[in-house]
Amino acid sequence: TLELSSAASDVYKRQEFLRNQISQRKTIYPPGKEIFNCFNLTSYEDTKVVILGQDPYHGAGQAHGLSFSVKDNISIPPSLKNIFKELNSDLKIKIPCSGNLTSWALEGVLLLNSSLTVESNNPNSHQNIGWNFFTDKVIEVLGNKKDMVYILWGKNAQLKKL
């Protein structure tokens, strides 16, 4: 939509910041080609649920553009273990061996973080670089859809206006 393209043009401004960080030899997660994975895997039309987190995991190999998700063969982080425990306790869903939530994304769950990037080993480091404008616009546009479900995990996520 036109509103999202306006927000997308703002993303260009983030690129300059990220290039600068990389030129200073800082490691940024997720890798560049994976920053927008949540949108590549879950289209606007297919989105039924938004799970909103704070920022990507900041450890090596963890973040891949889906909030709370890690790739196969990566240790499941404590936050995701807690989510799995709650799903098991409340809904009797078996706790998986992998923390890869790609299957959720393909089923219409938009796994979005308030900030789409983070510096290695520095949680919440990109909170103030402007990602909020973009993610606020995404949430605003999705708000036009009927019967959307929002799950807000983390303090920053809970501050979002729905």
Roles of regions detected by a PLM:
Residues 1-8, 12:
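Single conserved hydrophobic/aromatic residue that forms the stacking wall/gate
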Residues 13-152, 156-159:
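A polyanion-binding, active-site-adjacent surface
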